[in-house]
Amino acid sequence: MEYRCLDCTTGDTIAVDLKVFLDLKEFKSYLSNKWGVPRAQILLLYPFGIKLKDSNFRHASDLESPEIYVYDRRLFSLTNEPHTGADAHADSDADADADTADVEQQAAQLLDSLLEQRRHPQLQDDLIRPIPSPLEDLKIADGISHRTAVSMLTTNLGWLSALEIDVNYYSSISDKCKEDTQSLARCLGTCEQYLGLYCYDVERLYNSNVVFLDQLHENSLQSRWKECYKNTLTKLAGLNGYLSQYVDEAKQIEKEVTLKSLDGKVNSKLKQIKKELDSYADQRKSIQNEIENLKNIKDMKNDDNELHEMQKSFDSIADTVRKASRDILDKDDALFTDEYITQEVVPVMIDIQKKVKTLLTVSQALYENMHELLTHKRNFQIQIIVKLGQIAWIQLQISELKQYLLNDCNADLTLYKDLEVEFAQIEDYPLIYGLYLVEKYRRQVWKCGMAKNMISISNDIKERSAAELTTRKNWYKNFGELSKPFNEDLTKYNDLDEISKLMNSDSQFLKEKFIQDLRNEQRKLEDVIKSFIKNMHDLGLSKETTQVLEQSFKEASNSNICSQIDVTYDHRRINNENDLIKRYKIRIRKLESLLHEQGYSSISKWPSGVLNHTDRPNYFADNVSPAGRSLLVSSSALLGLEPSASLKTDAEMFDLKKEIGDLSEKVTALEKDNKLKTDQLKITHSKLIDIEVEKAAFRETLNHLNKELARLTVNEEDQTNLLKEERLRFKKEMTSVTVVNQNLMNNLDALQKTFEDVELENAHLKSKLKELQQRQDQLIEDSANEKLEIKSKYEKLIKEKDENMGQAFAVTNKAISGEQNKTESDIIHSSPYPEAILHLRTELFDIFSTNIYILENIGLLLTETSAGKFEIKRVKGLKKGLSQSLLDESAQISPIDGVINSVVYKNIRAQYEQLPNDNNISNCELFISSVKKIYENKLFESAVINRFKDIETLAKRLTKENKSKRILIDLYQNERLAVKDFRVNDLALFLPTKEALSETKSLSSSMASSFSSVDLSTPISGANNNITASRKSLHKPNVKHPWAAFTAFNESSRYFLKDENMVTDNKEWFIGKITDIQRQVVENISTNNPFKLPKDTVWYLISAEMISID
């Protein structure tokens, strides 16, 4: 059965099968890998608030609702007390709103932190607002060209594709967002039910205490013990007097008073607990109402039907626009004449333009709706964190109440019960005393019976000893003469005396030593007998004789004083078949010994060669004499063989043999059964080992499968996120390409117009240049003719008189100079460039200079590579020589030629400065191409944009660091300890002064020296001595010292503490928060001068709240 796991942080859901997880630990590990929540921070709840534990993990299939709610325990860290209606009346609305806003802000920060740690994408950041189509700004009614129409329609189709992707994305995440919101609402409701179950347990514990107290009240005997004491115990006599002597009346009266006070104490505690439980119940009810209100809030302003209608309308209009655009673009270019464009294309494009505006309006409405939905989800998440914090706060309070009930109330109720039991025992004293007398009588009876049994045992021992003595005498009488060669006097009975002494001895050591000696002798004799029988076998004596000795030795070995005990066993106590077989074997041996004893009870029936020698007479006939028979019987009785007396008939013998046969068959059957069961047990054990091996292999395979499933799940999620990122990147690139395409189209149109204007201007300039060249050729030809004429005149004049030569030469040179100057001025004024071109050239150089100046002001330098290409590089320290006042928008930029460091700029400026003195057009084209290089491939724009992005990133980082440092500064500011110029809410160190209030002389000077102008850098040894002295003085009895705030840095003002609540008692120092400061002036020494300060002294009376003490 699959279960839906709901994430309480994001609302995501996944389907899992709990059967693939071995335990709860593996399930939590899977959720941790899936959602990035630490395993230790995961809390799992079933429906109705049931907590998922190891004990109920395997019983999840019993639940009706297959859902598991996953909580991050860090969501409960923002504990805050919920506000009820009573709180709203008690506190001001402004304070409540401020607290709520503060908590919501902290919840938003916690949500961002958790989502960032889990790397959960923020959909608000992924939304891109739809941008207008380039077709909207086109003035179609004024007329358009075929090229413009095709370009705009193609661009509009790209815009329409991007817009459809955005709208489909809005629709997809809209449904998911609604599902997530519903999942979050169910998670919040389940957590509230969990709190209800927890509170129900505490209420049940409280009710059990109340019921127990009521039972104690109903069965209370504290009011009847006096009557019982006076009317019964004082009149009922026992062995040693009246029973009232066993009851201390004074102590019972004391306990009665204690019980009454304890009853009131327990009642007051339970009432207080009831009051707090009701308060928490009201807060829970308030949380329930708020949760219901949150669930009832609609996700969007418009209904789903309206959204679907908008989606359908958008799709319909988009299909119409695409079809109309394709109809135009698919037609042959030859059809696009001016008339066709005017009659056919323009109306269609106007209609497309209107529908494009409608599409933009619909898409923006969907965007706004999606943005509102995501904002609502985020606000809902914040509210969930706030409510979870309130639930955690109530649970903490309920937990404290539970501990209080379990510890304090239970202790009081236990004491209450013990006191009631003591009062109840007073009424039970007559019965208990009667039982005591009966028990004492029973012990007397037992003692009497025990004495009788001990006397009987003593008599039994004497009888057994006498019987043993008789047996020995009879044996000696029959065999004593034959045993004389063994050199042992068998007529002595020292061993019986030793046993008697041992019984009368109190030494445990002697008893143990006696028994150990007997065991040693027994082992020694046993070894001798075994060796003796072995030697008889080796010597080849009669087998019958050896068998008699072996059987006799076996009987003697098995004989003991307790052989009369019945050998039947209680089979109900036998737990092992081997023990049962062993007991049957023992019984068989016992029966065999009885048969053997019966067969050899008569000496005459012994085999030949046993005590039958030729040199000795036979003392007994075939039938044993009565004395010998009695001797055998006594011997058998002493050795514990009394059961043989019952086997006197052949019938009994037959029964015993039959029983031995049956028991042998049972033993054989049991041995076979035992062997069969042993084989079955071995087979079962081997199967169990195989099962364990298979189980281990299955567990290992399942672990590998779980790891592989987790890895595949993570990979799937990564691929999904990567696909989303690629889709968003594609949309952004499409948008940027659309914008760039539009800009390029606009630039192309502008350049086309400029090119046409330049072509016209160029043709005009070429015609003027041709005219100027013709005029220049004419002037050169005229000048050459004039020079030839002048030369001829000069040669003619040279022949004149010598006295007129110098004057004629001067006049001629003057004429030549004038003609030459006229020619040069004509050439200069005939420059090939018009004033408009010169003006454009100047403006172009100014724009270029300003751009280079802007680059260097933002730390970028224009350089040239070895290949002749321009580069813009980031150079540190470049702005040190530039103006630092450019942040002022009203400031004017100073001349920039002297502050630009770029070598490229200086080369281009040199080219520009040579243009007025050079009429070559190639130099002008070289200047224009050099300037154009900086704007090729968006070099200038890319450098500026990237630089501003770096500046923006740096600004964000610095803003974040500034915010954190501001928080630290505020924290340190709040914890700062003031030492001068005190104000309200400052923290100050308060110390006692050196003098008491009762001493008036030199008090002010000592106070001033104690707290003014303190050098904080001095060593602390002297301060320690002063503190020690002040401690000694503070410990003096009946001395009241005034307290003052510690001051430093030449602070001459005196700040005395207003100690109304005696907070300084038994303290050496404390840190307090100043709550009030009152300025005082000593106007009269005798009045209003509690500290005996000089006249006109300004001092301050401080009220402070204690923050920290020693």
Swiss-Prot record:
Reply yes or no: does the keyword Coiled coil apply.
yes
Query: How does the entry describe its membrane topology?
Result: Peripheral membrane protein
Per UniProt, which keywords does this protein have?
Autophagy, Coiled coil, Membrane, Protein transport, Transport, Vacuole, Virulence
Q: What is this protein for, i.e. what is its function?
A: Involved in cytoplasm to vacuole transport (Cvt), pexophagy, mitophagy and nucleophagy. Recruits mitochondria for their selective degradation via autophagy (mitophagy) during starvation. Works as scaffold proteins that recruit ATG proteins to the pre-autophagosome (PAS), the site of vesicle/autophagosome formation. Required for the Cvt vesicles completion. Contributes through its regulation of pexophagy to survival during engulfment by host phagocytic cells during infection.
- InterPro entries, alphabetically? ATG11, Atg11_C, ATG17-like_dom
Q: Name one GO cellular component term.
A: Atg1/ULK1 kinase complex
Q: Which domain of life is it from?
A: Eukaryota
**Binding partners and assembly:** Homodimer.
The UniProt entry's coiled-coil ranges are: 264-309, 651-803
Keyword Transit peptide listed? The answer is no
Spell out the family assignment given in the record's similarity comment: Belongs to the ATG11 family.
The record's section on Pfam families has:
ATG11, ATG17_like
Single annotated GO MF = protein kinase binding
**Where is it localised?**
Preautophagosomal structure membrane; Vacuole membrane
Source species: Candida glabrata (strain ATCC 2001 / BCRC 20586 / JCM 3761 / NBRC 0622 / NRRL Y-65 / CBS 138) (Yeast)
What Gene Ontology biological process does one annotation of this record name? pexophagy
Name of this protein: Autophagy-related protein 11
